[in-house]
Amino acid sequence: MSGQLLFFTSPIGLGHATRDIVIASKLNANITFISGEGAARMISDYGFLVKDLYRNKSFVVDDSGELQCAFRWIISYWSYYKKCKKIASNLIDRNETKLVVADEDFAATSVALENNIPNVVITDVLQTSFTKSTLFSAVEKKMNKGMKEMMRKSTLVIIPDYGEDHDNLAYVGPIVREISSSREKLREHFGFDRKTILVTIGGTDAGVFLINKAIRAYNEIKSRIDAEMIVVSGPSMNIGLQGVKHIGYVKNLHEMVYACDLLISLAGRSTTDEADVYGTPSIFIPIKNHFEQEDNARRHGFSFEDIDRLKDLILQKLEAARSDVKASNGAVRAMTLISNLLK
């Protein structure tokens, strides 16, 4: 395993895994992934070697869709970080690691820096802002300071967003999975013979509130629309739903996003990027007080309060025209930047 690339993927949700799969598929390198749970399963499904070692504690979101106990989650994240750092240290010590790539896994980044190993950080979050109180935010600010210092010292920081490169930060644009077929063929493959509303919440159970609200809204207006609703709840949930089609886990969810007529989703970055690139009309509802999702939703003209307008939004968006598929994809540039470090 001489000179290999260790690719550490955050297991929090599936968004990190989806973009890392795209980058890895374009790299000519000896890659071993390290992740956990649903993310590890997805990486394995795409044929990559992955060590399923990470176990994270999910956000606590109440039935109304509001993030609870944010400070407690930050403290539990610190414990998770220390466990991940031990795992990363053991793996890096055992292998002749040429490069460490870490998608929002700052434990692996820390180990790489301590061992003077070239490293790449992939992130769309340059700082967090979960907590509101003065006392708790002081702890978060300290963590942000450490995160920023690690990024400053890293060989390269890849940001899957639009922007101007500076210092060691490279803004490569959205990184999304490629479509394997035409939209018409995909609709036939998935059995989409009517207008199709796709509801998805990513890789955790944090979006159950959105599934329930979306189904309720759909049931109240379905007699007025010729459309079916399909719910993809992700690999970590086992729930029964009435009146809609329910799928637990889909390897190629991105192709369902492309094939559907309307997407209703949490405002996670990877999902919003996929919908943007594929031109799919969408409704993005963030978890309340989840700063990153609220920012993503705001960029698309939505807020948490729109959850009470789902009926009107569904009717409006089902009549919206699709945008053209965007040709630009940051995966190629990300691959090129990483490949240059392997030479």
PLM regions: where:
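A short, glycine/small-residue-rich beta-strand->loop->alpha-helix junction that serves as a flexible
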Residues: F7-I21, D205-F209
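Conserved nucleotide-sugar phosphate-binding/catalytic loop shared by glycosyltransferases and other
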Residues: P11, A29-Y81
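Donor-nucleotide binding loops and adjacent catalytic segments primarily
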Residues: A24, R183-L262
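Conserved nucleotide-sugar donor-binding subdomain of glycosyltransferases
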Residues: L67-L99, F106-A107
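A donor-sugar binding/catalytic signature common to diverse glycosyltransferases
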Residues: V100-D103, V121, N252-D295
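A nucleotide-sugar donor-handling region in carbohydrate enzymes
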Residues: T131, S137-D205, G234-P235
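Nucleotide-sugar donor-binding patch of glycosyltransferase catalytic domains
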Residues: A138, K245, V277-L318
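C-terminal alpha-helical cap of glycosyltransferases
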Residues: D312-Q316, K326-K343
